[in-house]
């Protein structure tokens, strides 16, 4: 049996749960989706991202562990989602002045919504700087002087 899973199951996780960021209790629905996938017992999964895989039980276990981590610490999911959106922008533009990148973030209401709804601690600008630094540390972006570039 073959399952085309889109973002519901990847070999090492799943996609960002955007409804959860917007205030819906969508982590429960994701858990139910993983239960359904498990009950279907697919032999092969074609994910929305990454290679086709056959170790479905292992992938489900990884996804459940990741989901449990997000349930225990929803701010972790928010940080992950924000970095995904930053990376998508870098994939789109490849390179741009850092000031323009930050201006884009500040002008994008979704980032402010995520910050206001899910986080406490640093101010918004500091949070964005931390996210960008994490992208650079992970090799997903490169800062060269006044420019930020896509990497990886």
Q: What annotation goes with each model-predicted range?
A:
Residues 78-152:
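C-terminal regulatory/interaction regions
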Residues 1-71:
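Metallo-beta-lactamase
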């Amino acid at each position: 049996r073959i399952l085309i899973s889109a973002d519901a199951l990847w070999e090492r996780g799943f996609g960002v749960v955007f409804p959860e960021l917007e205030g819906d209790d969508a982590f429960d629905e994701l858990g139910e989706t993983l239960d359904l996938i498990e009950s279907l017992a697919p032999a092969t999964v074609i994910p929305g991202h990454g290679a086709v895989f056959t170790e479905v039980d292992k992938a489900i276990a990884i996804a459940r562990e990741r989901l449990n981590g997000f349930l225990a610490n929803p701010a972790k999911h928010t940080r992950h989602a924000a970095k995904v959106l930053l990376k998508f922008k870098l994939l789109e533009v490849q390179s741009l002045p850092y000031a323009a990148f930050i201006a884009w973030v500040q002008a994008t209401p979704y980032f402010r919504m995520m910050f206001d709804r899910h986080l406490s601690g640093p101010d918004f600008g500091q949070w964005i700087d931390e996210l960008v630094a994490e992208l650079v540390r992970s090799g997903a972006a490169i800062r060269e002087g006044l420019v930020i570039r896509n990497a990886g």
